[in-house]
Swiss-Prot record:
Gene for this chain: fluC
Protein name in the entry: Fluoride-specific ion channel FluC
Reaction equations catalysed: fluoride(in) = fluoride(out)
TM region(s), chain numbering: 12-32, 41-61, 76-96, 104-124
Function: Fluoride-specific ion channel. Important for reducing fluoride concentration in the cell, thus reducing its toxicity.
Originating organism: Xanthomonas euvesicatoria pv. vesicatoria (strain 85-10) (Xanthomonas campestris pv. vesicatoria)
C-alpha cells in the first residue's frame, strides 16, 4: 500500500482531532459535574489516558509498518492530539496562581508529568504484549 498523500493524512488528523476534542469535552464536563471545579480532574484524566493510549498505539502501529500511516494520522495525531491538552494544563496552573493556590501548581505538574511518563511506558509495554500475541 502506498503512503497516503499529505491531504489524506490531513483529513484523517482533522477527523480524529474532532473526535478527540469531543471526548475531552465530554470527559471534562462529566468530571466537573461529579467532582466540581476545585481541581482540574478532566484535564488530568484526559492527559493521563492519552499518555497510556499513545504508548499502546505507537508500539502497535509501529509493528504494522508503513501501512499504518493513515491510522497514525487518525489515532495519534488526531484523536490523541485532540484528547490531550497542554494549553489547558498551563491555563489551570495560572488559575491556581491567581486564586492563591500556588502550592497546587507543583503537585499538579508533578502528578501529570510523572504519572504521564509511567503511563506512556505502561502503554508501550501493553502494545508490545499485544503485538507479540
Amino acid at each position: 500500500m502506498n503512503a497516503p498523500v499529505w491531504w489524506q493524512q490531513l483529513l484523517l488528523a482533522m477527523t480524529g482531532g474532532a473526535l478527540g476534542s469531543g471526548l475531552r469535552f465530554a470527559i471534562g464536563a462529566s468530571l466537573i459535574q461529579r467532582f466540581g471545579t476545585g481541581f482540574p480532574w478532566g484535564t488530568l484524566t484526559v492527559n493521563l489516558l492519552g499518555s497510556f493510549v499513545a504508548g499502546v498505539l505507537l508500539v502497535w502501529l509501529d509493528a504494522r509498518g508503513p501501512s499504518s500511516w493513515p491510522l497514525r494520522a487518525l489515532l495519534i495525531v488526531g484523536v490523541i492530539g485532540g484528547l490531550t491538552t497542554f494549553s489547558s494544563l498551563m491555563m489551570e496552573c495560572l488559575v491556581f496562581a491567581r486564586t492563591d493556590r500556588s502550592t497546587m501548581i507543583g503537585i499538579y505538574l508533578a502528578v501529570t508529568l510523572l504519572a504521564g511518563l509511567a503511563l506512556v511506558v505502561a502503554g508501550a509495554r501493553t502494545g508490545q504484549w499485544l503485538v507479540a500475541r
